[in-house]
Amino acid sequence: MTQAAEHITVLLHEAVEGLAIKPDGIYVDGTFGRGGHSRLILQQLGPNGRLIAIDRDPQAIAEAAKIQDPRFEIVHGPFSGIASYLDERGLLGKVDGFLLDLGVSSPQLDDAERGFSFMKDGPLDMRMDPTSGQSAAEWLARADVDDIAWVLKTFGEERFAKKIARAIVHDRVTEPYVRTRQLAEMIARVNPSKEKGKHAATRSFQAIRIYINSELDEIETALNGALQVLAPEGRLSVISFHSLEDRLVKHFIRKHEKGPEVPHGIPLTEAQLAGGRKLKSVGKALKPSEHEVNENSRSRSSVLRVAQRLAE
């Protein structure tokens, strides 16, 4: 395994502040990663507090094992399983805060062997959990032009999706794509787009990673799970890193702030209308400070949104 750079947790204090930690509360860190948010939450919990962390990356699980604290528990699995994990522990509707730090982490990006980065040569893997599911290389070896183009367009908003997809399918007849640099160099050759400050392969790598890990489906399932696990006044604190993630989070919060659509002409009282609302936004969407961006350029695109669970 190649040496990964030290992970700098993005919007660390802001995301945890959004949880409004109660010393004796129950909290869930849905994306343990290298434990930045979890460790800060533990610092703010009292002796009767509880923190359950989740991650599907075996390296994150190994990092979590270093935390010897009776208030802390780590679950190996996708964060989409939040409702199931909490149901098993008898904690549905009892959680005071749920935090999600979405996307790929710096250690995952910086470890060439994980296959997430087009900047370093490594096996074309891209799985958050390398022990489960198909790798990017396996999918690219089998998918047809239309499927590849759809993924690049849908999850990467790549303008030249069809051109890149055709090149992949054409080239793999003689030389399958199994290395990150091999794929990145081909995309740079066939993609005429010159986005300022962005490598030609950025959008394609993002798209393939999102597809391989079912990231948007995972997020949607986890957000719906949050409604099941959060207690009244419990907080949801979510950090997104690209427009697809943030759009999903923003629309989810807005949908449950408004409540269900009611056909025109059906008379409902204010109390009945309010009863359908499940969330309310807390503050405005927050971006990292200029200082944080200067310290950690990967934080530039991050957005934090916080919502509070309403009683039904």
Swiss-Prot record:
Its main location: cytoplasm. It comes from the Bacteria. It is found in: Cytoplasm. Belongs to the methyltransferase superfamily. RsmH family. Residues 287-298 have a biased composition (Basic and acidic residues). Its EC number is 2.1.1.199. One of its GO terms (molecular function) is rRNA (cytosine-N4-)-methyltransferase activity. Pfam families: Methyltransf_5. PANTHER family: 12S RRNA N4-METHYLCYTIDINE METHYLTRANSFERASE, S-ADENOSYL-METHYLTRANSFERASE MRAW. Residues 286-306 are annotated as: Disordered. This is Ribosomal RNA small subunit methyltransferase H. It comes from Aeromonas hydrophila subsp. hydrophila (strain ATCC 7966 / DSM 30187 / BCRC 13018 / CCUG 14551 / JCM 1027 / KCTC 2358 / NCIMB 9240 / NCTC 8049). Keywords: Cytoplasm, Methyltransferase, rRNA processing, S-adenosyl-L-methionine, Transferase. Specifically methylates the N4 position of cytidine in position 1402 (C1402) of 16S rRNA. GO terms for biological process: rRNA base methylation. Gene3D superfamilies: Putative methyltransferase TM0872, insert domain, Vaccinia Virus protein VP39. SUPFAM superfamilies: Putative methyltransferase TM0872, insert domain, S-adenosyl-L-methionine-dependent methyltransferases. InterPro entries: RsmH, SAM-dep_MeTrfase_MraW_recog, SAM-dependent_MTases_sf. It catalyses: cytidine(1402) in 16S rRNA + S-adenosyl-L-methionine = N(4)-methylcytidine(1402) in 16S rRNA + S-adenosyl-L-homocysteine + H(+). S-adenosyl-L-methionine binds at residues 35-37, 55, 79, 101, 108. One of its GO terms (cellular component) is cytoplasm.
